[in-house]
Swiss-Prot record:
Topology Cytoplasmic: residue spans: 1-21, 97-100, 162-169, 217-235, 288-298, 342-359, 434-489
Location(s), subcellular: Apical cell membrane
Similarity remark: Belongs to the ammonium transporter (TC 2.A.49) family. Rh subfamily.
Gene Ontology biological-process entries: ammonium homeostasis
Protein name according to UniProt: Ammonium transporter Rh type C
Keywords: Ammonia transport, Cell membrane, Glycoprotein, Membrane, Transmembrane, Transmembrane helix, Transport
One Pfam family per UniProt: Ammonium_transp
Gene3D superfamilies in alphabetical order: Ammonium transporter AmtB like domains
Topology of the protein relative to the lipid bilayer: Multi-pass membrane protein
Length: 489
């Protein structure tokens, strides 16, 4: 019996081999070749990007100017969303003192792979022509692909520094697949409205990553505690990511909203909610420290919670003061999450959430979904007009007889679907990632770029006393940087 246990332990917990010279190139080459083949078989330009079809469309619809092409309406929003995906998310994850290459570099890798797979997965569900078997893509498809990738990047935040790039490719492969299915169920079958993705992106991506992190729990992760934190310059780089996300979040939430008042209103509501969450985050962060000092962890993350929570309800008539209330509350809730919920989750639930995605994405996304359900159920003809209700909630076709109360119920059901897909899918993916074939780092080598990157030598070492704490704990109350000096030899 003891020999069997030793064999099992040896299979699932062998000595870590982080040499990915074969596995990473193999995965990248094979999967990219697969993308080329699948694109060749399925992907074609849509009517507004194919020259022949565009000329036919202009003639048929009496379009006199190329400015009517959807590209000119959607591309500014696409640019903003694309910057958020690769610069915003990438730099937000550079806060770790020795894992900035991995934060921004692996974000780049899985983003580039994920958007290709997303064009296929979402195309099969939303843009497949049954007569030709082809998928038509245009600028709106590019935006939706970026949205799809965002969920996997959010999941990466919970796993930051603890997994190999090969594992991240697997997380993205399954994450994009699960996203496409749950999005189709929520938006098409349940007919929920979720333009900014509180449910389908943030709630799903957050709990997907947290579940994987739970399955991959490392009881000896404290061996890398010296690296699980920030230094002054790494927090500054992370703040760059925060500012890009904060500035462009109105574009993120409104990018695929219908032209007209809905898109306009979505940008306004998101803009207002984001501003409100900044003030409440600063207030709670200062109040929680005995000398009133601000914690950069809170400022980098909780200030964005208003944008996450407004993702579903932003296109509804929530009113400007309603948007302020949403930002006000989520800024408080997110900051309290970093103060109390994350330490609780790590200690008692065995969930090691490196970036605190539960507080920035999962919890605000879930709240945003339920806020959307309440606002939808409370909609009236007096506020929207009958035509406005039809346009806002798309009460047409087989959904023409749906009431706002029923719509609110389905909106709430959409949140549950997102969480269910995240938890079940995350558990399965986590079990796959536990196989000893992925080249993941040992417990004492987590959060260290040197495992997977060629790292130049530092001119100066990092003094242990100047290390900032991580996104799970506070700084030691009795340590002040001014108490220490470096002696020159």
């Amino acid at each position: 019996m003891g020999n069997c246990a030793d064999c099992l332990r040896g299979f699932f917990c062998p000595p870590k081999n982080t040499n990915i010279r074969i596995s990473l190139p193999a995965v990248c080459f094979v999967w990219q070749i697969a993308m080329i083949v699948l694109f060749g078989v399925f992907i074609r330009y849509d009517a507004e990007s194919d020259i022949r079809l565009w000329l036919q469309l202009k003639h048929t619809n009496n379009i006199t100017s190329d400015i009517e092409n959807d590209f000119y309406f959607r591309y500014p929003s696409f640019q903003d969303v694309h910057v958020m995906i690769f610069v915003g998310f990438g730099f937000l994850m550079t806060f770790l003192k020795r894992y900035s290459f991995g934060g921004v570099g692996f974000n780049f890798l899985i983003g580039a792979f994920g958007l290709q797979w997303a064009l296929l997965m979402q195309g099969w569900f939303h843009a497949l022509d049954p007569t030709t078997g082809k998928i038509s893509i245009g600028v709106e498809g590019l935006i939706n692909a970026d949205f799809c990738v965002a969920a996997s990047l959010i999941a990466y935040g919970a796993l930051l520094g603890k997994v190999s790039p090969v594992q991240l490719m697997v997380v993205t492969l399954f994450g994009v697949t699960l996203f496409a299915v749950e999005e189709y169920i929520i938006l098409n079958l349940l007919h929920c409205r979720d333009a900014g993705g509180s449910m389908v992106i943030h709630c799903f991506g957050g709990y997907y990553g947290l579940t994987i992190s739970w399955i991959l729990y490392r009881p000896k992760l404290h061996q890398s505690k010296r690296l699980n934190g920030s230094v002054y310059h790494s927090d500054v780089f992370a703040m760059i990511g925060t500012l890009f996300l904060w500035m462009f979040w109105p574009s993120f939430n409104s990018a695929i909203t219908d032209h007209g008042s809905g898109q306009h209103r979505t940008a306004i509501n998101t803009y207002i909610a984001l501003a409100s969450s900044v003030l409440t985050t600063v207030a709670i962060s200062s109040a929680s420290e005995k000398r009133g000092k601000l914690d950069m962890v809170h400022i980098q993350n909780a200030t964005l919670a208003g944008g996450v929570a407004m993702g579903t309800a932003a296109e509804f008539m929530i009113t400007p003061y309603g948007a302020l209330i949403v930002g006000f509350c989520t800024g408080i809730i997110s900051t309290f999450g970093y103060l109390f919920v994350s330490p609780f989750m790590e200690k008692y639930l065995k969930i090691q959430d490196t970036c605190g995605v539960h507080n920035l994405h999962a919890m605000p996304g879930m709240l945003g979904g339920f806020i959307g359900a309440i606002v939808a159920a409370a909609a009236t003809e007096e506020v929207y007009s009958r035509e406005g209700l039809i346009e806002t909630f798309d009460f047409e076709g087989k959904f023409a007889d749906r009431t706002v109360g029923t719509q609110g119920g389905f909106q709430a059901a959409g949140v549950c679907v997102a969480i269910a897909f995240a938890v079940v899918g995350g558990a399965v993916v986590g079990l796959i990632l536990r196989l000893p074939i992925w080249g993941d780092p040992a417990d004492d080598n987590c959060f260290d770029d040197e495992v997977y990157w060629e790292v130049p030598e530092d001119e100066e070492g990092i003094l242990p006393v100047l290390e900032y704490n991580n996104h799970m704990t506070h700084k030691h109350q009795d340590i002040s940087e001014s108490n220490f000096s470096v002696e020159q030899s």
